Amino acid sequence: MKFQRLAALTCFVAAGILISSCDKETPRQEQKPAQPTTPVVQPEEPAAPGEARVAVAQPGGLEAALKGQDLEQLTKLTVRSGVLNQADLDYVTKSLKIEAIDLSTATLRLGDEDKGFYGNSTLKKITAPADIEKTQKDWFSNTLATEIIFPGNKLKSFGGAVYNEKLKSITLPNSVEEIGAAAFANSNFESITLSTSLKSIPT
């Protein structure tokens, strides 16, 4: 009899423990918020000796952007951002002695009657803005540049003549649809890259 009571008591206690353990919630693992992925930014290579890289705050602001630079030693200028106007290009032609200018990430704001780089006697390589859509008569004329590059695919009309016996190479993007008459007169090209979108080639 005592054994039966003891067995019953044991079963009751065991059942109580089981019920008690079922009532307890299993603790949840706290989920840590996902860490944001930080993009890897490649450090920019330092400017080479004689090179300046500037951002122009406003049209006509190139001279101010070059303040503090050793202009006598400057041979290459890269304008990383900003809008340049005719006053900026006049400053390049009249006050600087650079041999290369890279405007691929800048913007030119010139009127149809503006002269651009006309008459520049030191530039050997000109890289035009990637967003330029047209060129006019004198913008790249009568320079001593041996190479002119038009990056990007915005240029539709190459309307100006270069009139440059020194020019050996010019690269026009595939977006160009028309070339002005006598555009390459008085030039001695060794290499010319024309657009596949040209509707006609002037003679």
Where are these regions (language model features)?
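Short acidic, Gly/Pro-enriched loop/turn segments at secondary-structure junctions
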Residues: 85-89
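Leucine-rich repeat
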Residues: 65-70, 90-94, 115-119, 139
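C-terminal motif of bacterial Sec signal peptides marking the signal peptidase cleavage site
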Residues: 18-21
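Structural signature of tandem-repeat unit edges
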Residues: 51-57, 75-84, 97-109, 121-134, ...
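Short, low-complexity, disordered segments immediately C-terminal to signal peptides
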Residues: 26-42
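Bacterial N-terminal signal peptides that target proteins for export
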Residues: 1-8
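The feature captures the LRR N-terminal capping module
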Residues: 41-70
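Consensus positions within tandem repeat domains that build extended binding/scaffold surfaces
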Residues: 116, 136-139, 159-161, 180-183, ...
